[in-house]
Amino acid sequence: MTNHGDFAHPSLLNAMTDIASQAAAAIMRVRENGAVARLKTDSSPVTEADEAAEAIILEGLARILPGIGVVSEEAAAQTETFQVPDPFILVDPLDGTREFIEGRDEFTVNIAIIQNGRPISGIVGAPALGTIWRGAMASGSERLHLPAGVAAKDAKDRSPLHTSAHRGGAWRAMVSRSHLDPATEAWLTRFSAIERMDCGSSVKFCRIAEGKADVYPRLGRTSEWDIAAGDAVLSAAGGLVLTPEGEPVRYGQVARNLKVPSFVAWCGAADAAKYSTV
């Protein structure tokens, strides 16, 4: 559908959005029928919704981007070694499986294209919220009101996304509902006052991209497919996703088995520069 240098083309972003929307519809069908969870070898939960969504996404990506390598969470669970080309695609078919199982609405479909170690475009779809956030470094980010299964061309509402710098007072801090750890709690003490906003999945990145939050620290290990799409949306909206040392998170790191030791998502460069190394 496109050459490697054209990953931000609107037609490709729409095609990726349609794939995410189709996967969202499959997830919602499983939710309506009652999801049954089981544990993977790493003790994390998986459901038939994860697998149904992944099958739709992989088939769709093979159709619109033939020959581009894909690393997807459920397929990756079957291997201990990775071969990552450049460019490649990172997929989490159902981010926030715990939230999904518990009946919450904060679970997402994540798709990101990675080139030269950074996400250049990404889709975060929240099936239960009827929302898709998408971003490309060449064109910016936007939020679409898009119920599961609806094509991008039929979106009823589109809003451009721009982060907002911290405006003083309490820091609006997104924190993980399922993975909050003591190291993250300690990191947050650098701010004199915080307004905690508990949330699951990649929705946390998107709230910062919308200007509704200021920072999201995660000092525990996570996988690249968990955060790449959120990074794409936030970075294209004016934010940053950095290591605690202030460097951009790099993707395709096979020496770490595609794990990210820790990161902090920021609303803007000035705030990151001021507080990253406090």
Explain the meaning of each model-derived region.
Residues 111-206, 254-278:
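Acidic beta-strand-loop-alpha-helix segment within the catalytic core
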